[in-house]
């Protein structure tokens, strides 16, 4: 296989990733193998290595960055002012999460519609080298990586700077949007500033709340909050997908209000449709045959990453009490994550709960459509891709009253917006069950409203708004 740099070839026997294949991702080329520090679990010593590695990587490459600065300045003069080129960078691009999935959908759409967008991140530690997936997603060779504290199957990584510089010379950009405030993003930020590239950020992850939820050490929350203030102070303006987090950026992270821009996200909703309902996909995972079901149960689902910060411990307790009262309800968990085995153990012997594993394509879309109600109690999501996807198949959603999802759902019309209180969720589940069983016309109206609500989150509307903002940002940054 030819490498991204065009210099060497890997052997046909070389494994490109020791993880199971992730749906929809195909390696189209690779980087040559490069030195990296051995991947390690989190620890004080390992964490203490991050700042020296970041600053050493920056210092070593300053001469090349200054040379790149001069090259990009000349190249930019030869292009029209409204010709904007942007690089989206996320350290967690090589994982299964909402950020990675959203970016991997948005960037191909932008490129297909003549928007000059590029996507890069760090290759996961299970890869022997960097790679390019689907001809557009650049997973850079890593210099350093360690497991993320309190968050299995995720890592903190620092990419090698050399390949980044070569790619920026080959594909010059005007703007870099940083998606996550991780070590690699700090390094890219510093390098971009030296190279004279305008850098800004997108508040996609509520890192302080994640830290408070997943890490036992209380001091870590305040330390992370301090780091976030510095990071978002360096990467203004900051894009927020919803009002709640725009307020957090100004109140907690001290970003000036005029430096916060609300830009709702878009999703490729054409693959999600109410027409996929009733095709027999749900029955493949709940242990029954379509013909064998005399009475169809009321179906609830959670679809997404199975991890604790999604507030699934709360959902488990609520469901246990709700299902104890009814034998005509069932809950389907769809997805994979480090918390999955704990949930299976919690529901061991409970016939009302099923697990479909990680799914994609038509199977995933059909599971959304087959659900009667979608449950999403997370209080850490800045947007809620899965909520939009569920509603795009006509499935009403029950969400928390905090974060991005409650901006999507219309309370009592396309679902319910609820405080994180067990009684409130139990009452909503009871009402949802009653509505489905006793008022089919009202339930169908709710499905139609949910579907119509998602039309504002199409890829077309969101990318158009984004690029209009990017053009404005470029003109302000370079005084064009």
Please tell me what each predicted stretch does.
Residues 88, 284-320, 332:
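Conserved donor-binding/catalytic core segment of Leloir-type glycosyltransferases
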Residues 123, 244, 266:
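Carbohydrate-associated surface elements
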Residues 168, 358-359, 366-371:
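Short alpha-helical donor nucleotide-sugar binding micro-motif in glycosyltransferases
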Residues 198-200, 208-230, 277-279:
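Nucleotide-sugar donor phosphate/pyrophosphate-binding loop at the beta->alpha transition
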Residues 341-359:
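Nucleotide-activated donor-binding/catalytic signature segment of Leloir-type glycosyltransferases, i.e.
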Residues 379:
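Aromatic "clamp/platform" in nucleotide-sugar-dependent glycosyltransferases that forms part
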Residues 396-399:
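Short hydrophobic beta-strand element within catalytic cores of glycosyltransferases
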Residues 411-412, 416-423, 432-437:
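Conserved acidic donor-binding segment of nucleotide-sugar-dependent glycosyltransferases
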């Amino acid at each position: 296989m030819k490498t991204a740099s065009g210099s060497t070839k890997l052997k046909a026997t070389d494994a490109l990733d020791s993880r199971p294949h992730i749906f929809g991702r195909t390696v189209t080329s690779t980087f040559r193998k490069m030195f990296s520090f051995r991947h390690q679990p989190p620890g004080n010593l390992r964490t203490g290595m991050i700042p020296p590695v970041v600053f050493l990587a920056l210092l070593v490459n300053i001469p090349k960055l200054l040379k790149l600065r001069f090259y990009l300045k000349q190249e930019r003069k030869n292009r029209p002012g409204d010709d904007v080129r942007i690089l989206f960078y996320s350290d967690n691009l090589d994982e299964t999460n909402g950020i990675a999935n959203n970016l991997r959908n948005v960037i191909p759409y932008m490129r297909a519609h003549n928007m000059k967008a590029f996507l890069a991140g760090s290759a996961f530690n299970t890869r022997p080298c960097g790679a390019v997936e689907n001809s557009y997603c650049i997973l850079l060779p890593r210099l350093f990586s360690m497991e993320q504290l309190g968050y299995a199957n995720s890592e903190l990584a620092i990419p090698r700077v050399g390949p980044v510089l070569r790619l920026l010379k080959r594909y010059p950009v005007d703007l870099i949007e940083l998606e996550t405030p991780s070590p690699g993003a700090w390094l890219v930020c510093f390098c971009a500033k030296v190279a004279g590239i305008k850098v800004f950020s997108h508040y996609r992850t509520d890192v302080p709340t994640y830290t408070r939820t997943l890490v036992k050490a209380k001091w870590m929350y305040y330390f992370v909050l301090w780091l976030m203030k510095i990071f978002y102070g360096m990467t203004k303006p900051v894009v927020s997908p919803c009002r709640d987090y725009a307020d957090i950026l100004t109140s907690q992270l001290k970003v000036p209000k005029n430096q916060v821009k609300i830009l709702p996200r878009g999703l490729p909703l054409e693959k999600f449709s109410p027409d996929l309902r009733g095709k027999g996909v749900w029955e493949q995972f709940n242990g029954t045959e379509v013909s064998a079901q005399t009475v169809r149960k009321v179906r609830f689902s959670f679809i997404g990453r199975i991890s604790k910060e999604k507030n699934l411990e709360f959902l488990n307790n609520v469901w246990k009490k709700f299902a104890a009262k009814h034998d005509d309800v069932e809950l389907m968990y769809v997805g994979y994550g480090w918390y999955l085995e704990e949930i299976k153990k919690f529901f061991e012997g409970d016939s009302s709960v099923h697990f479909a594993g990680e799914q994609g394509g038509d199977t995933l879309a059909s599971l959304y459509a087959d659900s009667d109600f979608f449950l999403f109690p997370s209080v850490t999501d800045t947007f809620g891709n899965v909520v939009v996807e569920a509603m795009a198949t006509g499935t009403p959603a029950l969400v928390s009253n905090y974060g991005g999802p409650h901006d999507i759902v219309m309370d009592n019309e396309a679902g319910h917006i609820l405080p994180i209180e067990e009684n409130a969720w139990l009452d909503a589940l009871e009402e949802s069950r009653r509505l489905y069983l006793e008022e089919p016309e009202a339930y169908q109206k709710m499905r139609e409203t949910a579907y119509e609500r998602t039309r504002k989150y199409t890829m077309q509307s969101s990318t158009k708004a984004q690029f209009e903002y990017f053009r404005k940002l470029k003109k302000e940054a370079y005084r064009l």
